[in-house]
């Protein structure tokens, strides 16, 4: 929703959201989640066996995994904060995600108050990597601002993501970082919104969304680029 004038930017968390399977024509085949609360942001492992998603079923926005048929649901994260936007590594053994993780008393109160209203403020987020079961959790960015929309390079050794850490506002550009948090490199240099990057499985193509060249409108389009390591 559009925030009121002078208010902070927020996202809605709809408690009616569930996860479904659809065929390629858009027909619903099966409902995978039925718990009360927000179940969304689902992505499928490249191995085709598991799904990772964000849920409020425990009272906070945590990551969970389940089998591709919806069975064997397991909680992955357990710390206060908005854990979401998760993707599997190419070999299906790790997860990359972004999280808000409030620490101060005032930040914790604000987070809880907003969540009680079905809202989150996605303006302070960092990237984390962990094993699929949640073990070996590591924070790989500490840049400030909103660092989000992470995606693994097909090598499994690098992460591409969107960030506004240089300005803390606008624009958002794409950055590359090693999975251990070293070697930060800027990829796009637009005065626009560049986000949601994804590699082709062979690593030769990059697709991302951007509102560049939109004639001054609020339109966001998809772009494809060659990727050269």
Task: Please report, for each region that a protein language model flagged, where it lies by residue.
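A flexible loop/linker signature enriched in serine peptidases of the S9 family
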Residues: 1-18, 31-39, 54-64, 68, ...
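Hydrophobic beta-strand positions that form the internal "hydrophobic ladder"
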Residues: 51-52, 95, 159, 206
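Right-handed parallel beta-helix/beta-solenoid
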Residues: 81-84, 92
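CBM-like carbohydrate-recognition segments
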Residues: 198-199, 206-212
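Short loop/turn segments that connect beta-strands within beta-propeller blades
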Residues: 23-27, 67-71, 131-135, 178-182, ...
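Right-handed parallel beta-helix
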Residues: 72, 93-94
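Residue-level detector of Asp-centered blade-edge/turn motifs that repeat once per structural unit
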Residues: 46-47, 90-91, 154-155, 201-202
């Amino acid at each position: 929703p559009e925030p009121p004038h002078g208010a902070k930017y927020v996202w809605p968390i709809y408690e009616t959201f569930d996860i479904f399977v659809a065929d390629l024509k858009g027909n619903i085949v099966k409902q995978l989640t039925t718990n009360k609360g927000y179940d969304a942001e689902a992505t499928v492992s490249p191995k085709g066996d598991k799904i990772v998603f964000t849920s409020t079923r425990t009272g906070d926005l945590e990551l969970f995994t389940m089998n591709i048929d919806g069975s064997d649901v397991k909680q992955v994260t357990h710390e206060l904060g908005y854990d979401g936007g998760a993707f599997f590594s190419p070999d299906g053994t790790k997860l990359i995600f972004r999280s808000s993780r409030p620490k101060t008393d005032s930040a914790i109160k604000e987070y809880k108050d907003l969540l009680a209203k079905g809202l989150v403020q996605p303006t302070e987020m960092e990237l984390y990597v962990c094993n699929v079961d949640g073990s070996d959790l590591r924070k790989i960015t500490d840049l400030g601002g909103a660092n989000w929309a992470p995606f693994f390079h097909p090598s499994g050794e690098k992460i591409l993501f969107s960030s506004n850490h240089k300005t803390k506002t606008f624009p958002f550009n794409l950055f590359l970082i090693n999975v251990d948090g070293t070697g930060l490199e800027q990829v796009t240099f637009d005065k626009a919104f560049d986000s949601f990057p994804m590699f082709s499985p062979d690593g030769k193509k990059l697709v991302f969304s951007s509102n560049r060249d939109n004639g001054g409108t609020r339109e966001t389009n998809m772009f494809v680029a060659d990727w050269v390591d």
